[in-house]
Amino acid sequence: MNNLQYRDFIIVGILLKDISLHSENGIIKDNWIYIQEPYVKIARIGIINNWSPYMVKDKNCIYVGVEYMCFENDELWSMKEDDFIKFTIDEMKKLKLIKDEDVISSNIIKMKKAYPSYTGVYNEFHKIREYTDKIENLFLAGRNGMHRYNNMDHSMICGIEAANCILSDNKDKTVIWEVNTEEEYHEVKSEK
């Protein structure tokens, strides 16, 4: 099953003096802003301060994670880090979210295979599960292990359930595979 497909991921962290995302009570309270504008490649902006006030040392600053979905070795992935950071700042300026003088510092992280894709041979993944479920001491978990779009909480629950199976000598891994199967949770394309 070498043909399972993934999207890769680049996140640029930018520490800012200000950002044009305010409500009457200060910065907006959203954790993520999904970007749909066709003239930029940004997929999502995470406002790290909103996850926890302890995530940013200087309470007068805003730290954002600007996210890009890409493929390893494509145009975005292949950019030099300094060029990519400049590109990201330029995109944030195109969105009228920041000005050059707002930027204090930045960093970049690239993650291969961050997002499992439900394309290609994904419809044959059950063969992997059937094979690996027979290996008593092997428990698949997380996005890459299960080739499933699990969030951190789902991955942690899978790990806890795997530990429970081990501790109780339970060979049935169904409880692990049932994590993140709630239909109301998933984002699906609606038919109009």
Please give the residue ranges for each predicted region.
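Mid-domain catalytic core of redox enzymes
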Residues: 1-82, 86-97, 174-184
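FAD/FMN-dependent oxidoreductases across multiple families
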Residues: 7-9, 27-30, 39-54, 100-134, ...
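A short, terminal or domain-edge coil/loop segment
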Residues: 63, 68-69, 88-94, 98-102, ...
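Short Gly/Pro-enriched loop/turn and capping motifs at secondary-structure junctions
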Residues: 71-73, 113-114, 145-147
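C-terminal lid/capping helical subdomain adjacent to the catalytic/cofactor pocket in oxidative enzymes
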Residues: 109, 118-192
